[in-house]
Amino acid sequence: MKTPSQPRAIYYIVAIQIWEYFSFYGMRALLILYLTHQLGFDDNHAISLFSAYASLVYVTPILGGWLADRLLGNRTAVIAGALLMTLGHVVLGIDTNSTFSLYLALAIIICGYGLFKSNISCLLGELYDENDHRRDGGFSLLYAAGNIGSIAAPIACGLAAQWYGWHVGFALAGGGMFIGLLIFLSGHRHFQSTRSMDKKALTSVKFALPVWSWLVVMLCLAPVFFTLLLENDWSGYLLAIVCLIAAQIIARMMIKFPEHRRALWQIVLLMFVGTLFWVLAQQGGSTISLFIDRFVNRQAFNIEVPTALFQSVNAIAVMLAGVVLAWLASPESRGNSTLRVWLKFAFGLLLMACGFMLLAFDARHAAADGQASMGVMISGLALMGFAELFIDPVAIAQITRLKMSGVLTGIYMLATGAVANWLAGVVAQQTTESQISGMAIAAYQRFFSQMGEWTLACVAIIVVLAFATRFLFSTPTNMIQESND
């Protein structure tokens, strides 16, 4: 019997997903280098801005999802988000010497990312009935598409920026998003079954004006608001407010469902360890990128490899790790039992620690010989990428076993995305030249060593905890969703 093919609309979603990842990760690979090289920001300022931007892009999808659910529909939200991200890159590329253009461009991209990121997966979900067996394959295709974009982006945008200038690198990132949008719009006839804008809600009157007019005002003011946050380094205050709200939600869950309190505490612990992991992993876009730019010998075949290209190593490692992880989870490889959740977490952190130890070794080599080894750096980054698939997929798999998985997944993403990126900036400032004047290489060596040592200590704690409490993640059956939910 022939297996039904995927809906035609999925290929347009996959196309825009590839180009969105290309746009986002292309610009991200250039950002810290652009701030320090072109605009002359010191390390402290550059890392603070980079971490603020990286954290805020994980806050706005909450609002973007709400707007799509209440007013816009997923398809319209995706289109609006893609347009805003394209506009943001255009603003960034017009004047690469203006700090105001920088802040405004990042703010526009943050708003666009919020509308796009939270709704592209929801739009894909609309293509399937609840029990459609093609659903898992569709989401796997979407995930693979993202990896293609994130691998290609640092290579293409990095080479463009090095050969033709920053404005070309940013233009390429924005152009990719625009190409993805055009492909997506060309398939509009395949999205007839998806939810459209709620015209009745948009034309209803609230506070003396139609709702659509308030929406326009909000879309115009939001970039101004985020520009102020970035320019004045106020993002931490917004993040603190959002985290307090998230903590209150979990506390109310514990009060409302006392029988679930133990499982909720376990999820909170997962969030804590996941956040720790991503504080370390997000050093790749700031501290590690600056180290590569300044101290790694990037000559290969008489060509200087652009620093941005190293951002592709992580994505390549994630794809390769997916194959290995699938093998580990297969029935043939389980042995006596499936690897326990906390041992998987410990293994992921162990790989991260080994990666940082390799970086510390490379920094020591640079201190002695003047330059670090590109091969050692790539090996360290690959280990860090490999570690990723032992953290997030494991945590999400456990969270989604619970009845209140939607809210908890959102809070987990907030913790490991927004909070981790902001804290990563705080941690990274240990290496800033303004704090350790004239001893940059020593600062990097000490930083990488400390990160590796602290992570190894966390691994030891988690392993002891896992063996000391045999049923650490045994969950009451009434917490777990029924199989037919």
UniProtKB/Swiss-Prot annotation:
Recorded family membership: Belongs to the major facilitator superfamily. Proton-dependent oligopeptide transporter (POT/PTR) (TC 2.A.17) family.
Consequence when changing residue 388 to Q: Decrease in activity. Does not bind Ala-Lys dipeptide
UniProt entry keywords in alphabetical sequence: Cell inner membrane, Cell membrane, Membrane, Peptide transport, Protein transport, Symport, Transmembrane, Transmembrane helix, Transport
Entry's Gene Ontology cellular component terms: plasma membrane
Coiled coil: none
Localization annotation: Cell inner membrane
Molecular function as annotated in GO: dipeptide transmembrane transporter activity; peptide:proton symporter activity; proton transmembrane transporter activity; tripeptide transmembrane transporter activity
Mutation effect (residue 388 to A): Lack of activity
Membrane topology note: Multi-pass membrane protein
The UniProt record lists the keyword Transport: yes
The name this protein goes by in its record: Dipeptide and tripeptide permease C
Periplasmic topological intervals: 34-46, 94-102, 162-164, 230-234, 284-307, 362-375, 428-446
Residues on Cytoplasmic side: 1-12, 68-70, 126-140, 186-208, 256-262, 329-340, 397-406, 468-485
Stored InterPro entries: Dipep/tripep_permease, MFS_dom, MFS_trans_sf, MFS_Transporters, POT_fam, PTR2_symporter_CS
Organism of origin: Escherichia coli (strain K12)
pH dependence per the entry: Optimum pH is around 6.5.
Summary of the function given for this chain in its UniProt record: Proton-dependent permease that transports di- and tripeptides. Shows significantly higher specificity towards dipeptides than tripeptides. Has a preference for dipeptides with a C-terminal Lys residue. Can bind Ala-Lys, Lys-Ala, Ala-Ala. Can also transport alanine and trialanine.
Subunit structure: Monomer.
GO aspect biological process, one term: protein transport
Transmembrane annotation, as ranges: 13-33, 47-67, 71-93, 103-125, 141-161, 165-185, 209-229, 235-255, 263-283, 308-328, 341-361, 376-396, 407-427, 447-467
